[in-house]
Amino acid sequence: MAAAQQLARVGHHIVVLEKNDRIGGLLRYGIPDFKMEKIHIDRRVKQMEEESVVFKTNQNVGENVKPDDLINEYDAVILAGGAEWPRDLPIPGRELDGVHFAMDFLPLQNKVVAGDKFEDQIMATNKHVVVIGGGDTGSDCVGTSNRHGAASISQFELMPQPPESENKLLAWPYWPLKMRTSSSHEEGCDRDWSIATKSFVDDGNGKVKELIASKVKWEDGKMKEIPGSEFKLKADLVLLAMGFISPQQKILDLFNVEKDQRGNAKADTEGESSYATSKNKVFAAGDMRRGQSLVVWAIREGRQCARSVDEFLMGKTTLPR
């Protein structure tokens, strides 16, 4: 959307394709309403429509949209999808009912808030919830579970507990390593660090009833289980929120673009062909190019990519970098 608006403002005809039934991607379906109300997305979409941007929903590349058709019909194509390939936890019991990816849980809740109805909605009501993963997505699972009325909520993180404040001499230019407590955590949650989940236990009917985990310690960047630290924890609902590996590979493969070592679309951010992929006329920005990251990075890269596309099409550009 950031790239689309910039390009529309310098006179290009822009079409935005969205695979879901509403515009907004991960902003709409990945972030809970208590964290970001969707009125902000709706307002921006309306603004962009008045600037002549065309939005099309239910457009799924590889299903009802062919990459070759896009390349032939348009002068440039920007791949700007989110990093949606979640990191899995391949341990015994992973297949049990009640063990879900966070991104199977959160989007459903957002759709319900928007007025949709589902027969098989994943609910945390009166359940003992365990969230595996200590990042922002895990925090969103905690907040959503609290709003469902969970019986208990525990959140596990594999890495050690960070310090209360960062080391100022070592932080820049990296993301400061320090303890972070969100409003979701403050609403109620038991948090623990250096925890490795070993298996999920079947209740005899194909549903998870508890998990088995242990404490670990880290030495020289390697994880070691602490002998005698194994424990069991009741769990009716387990949410896997351990980050994302890369964008969905299907789209990148269909466009036949070169990838980097992490499975993202390979494209430089500097030089004459910045944000251009190995495929002529095809550009990539945001999570599709850099992997899992923050909304602000997606906006920045979208705006920079728009400049590169404008220069590619017109031979020059007045868009800011």
For the regions a language model picked out, list residue spans one by one:
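FAD-site-proximal beta/loop scaffold in flavoenzymes
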Residues: 95-126, 219-292
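Redox-cofactor binding/interface segments in oxidoreductases and associated redox assembly factors
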Residues: 79-80, 101, 131, 240
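Glycine-rich Rossmann-fold phosphate-binding loop(s) that bind the pyrophosphate
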Residues: 1, 133-135, 287
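Beta1/beta-strand and adjacent pyrophosphate-binding region of the FAD-binding site
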Residues: 124-135
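A conserved FAD-binding loop/helix module that cradles the flavin
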Residues: 138-143, 148, 279, 288-320
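Feature captures the FAD/FMN-dependent oxidoreductase FAD-binding
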Residues: 42-92, 198-213, 217, 234-239, ...
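Beta1-alpha1 glycine-rich phosphate/pyrophosphate-binding loop at the start
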Residues: 1-61, 87-94, 104, 138-185, ...
